[in-house]
Amino acid sequence: EIFAFISDTPLGSASIAQVHRAELLSGEQVVIKVQRTGIYEIMARDIGLLRKAVKLMPPISLKGMADFDQVLDELWNVTREEMNFLTEASNMEEFARRNADVVYVRTPKLYQEYTTMHVLVMEYIEGPAIDDKEKLLAGGYDLEEIGIKLIDNYIKQVMEDGFFHADPHPGNVKIQDGKIVWIDMGMMGRLTERDKELIGKAIRGIAENDIGMIQEAVMALGEFKEKPDQSVLYEDISELMSKYGSLDMGEIDVAEVMMDLMEVMKENKIRMPHGLTMLARGLTNMEGVLADIAPQINMIEIASRHISESMWKDLDWKKELKHAGKNLYRSMHKAVEVPGLAADALHGLMKGQTRVNLDLHASNDLAQLLRRLVRNVV
């Protein structure tokens, strides 16, 4: 009554669902995402086994490590969101609405009337994956232009919308008719206005080389059971600033910055909110895509432009002039030129990955269980 044709062979298959190509009676080409039978129970069982494994670990093995219960709670929450296709449908609609004015970006058309918690029907996208350089070049595309627009839009999702794709691997980004098409909205991240405000505060601290301001932002953003040693955190941030402060933006490696930031947060036992944890994953994927299709592009340079523009646009001039004076604005005007800005702009954006950056050497069995679960979730 709905489909004229459904392919028996799946276009793709993962632990949670399979995707089949189909044709509506109207002739429209679509894909059907069908959830695997019993997957909810299977995932719930796996999480339960992991919780039991954590309880069996000797207490000494947890010293200095992340809060496993919290990590498992986060994994379970993310998994449940992905298993509700109505949530993904809502994400698609919100993403399309927020990017309606971006002429080079789109998302597949959603067929809401055919979508349920366990079945999602959307437009079939005919086009190469964003990392298929051979097909893109054969189609006359400029890889550098694609890379710039990809990152520009992603930073817009993060800094302006506070609603971003949290799993932007190459299979989830295609090129069709000159546009970047974002697909698979099952895993999306959000940043609150407070998150963005505090990130902005950290950036301003970097622009002024004000380690205390950065530290205040980090403390306000982070979550911790015991208050970190302020002097140690200050010294760690100072050391990080000195490491990247002499580099040009184009010389800064995002992956290296992330590793350093994660280590600082881990050493100070600071965890980031869920949204920033998701952002860490997304930015890592973005860096990988860029390295493949246009390695000459530096993501931090593009991000810094957005950050600088956002700071100017969002400033409350009367309030800021009263409290900070004109020198603050001269400092922010130089934001793009400050080498340390880009490295630490990610301070508030990427350090959340420490929540899942676990040191599992104490238990190989648990490490294997976690790896298996993560593969299932992904």
Please provide the spans of the model-predicted regions:
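Conserved catalytic cores of large enzyme domains
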Residues: 1-378
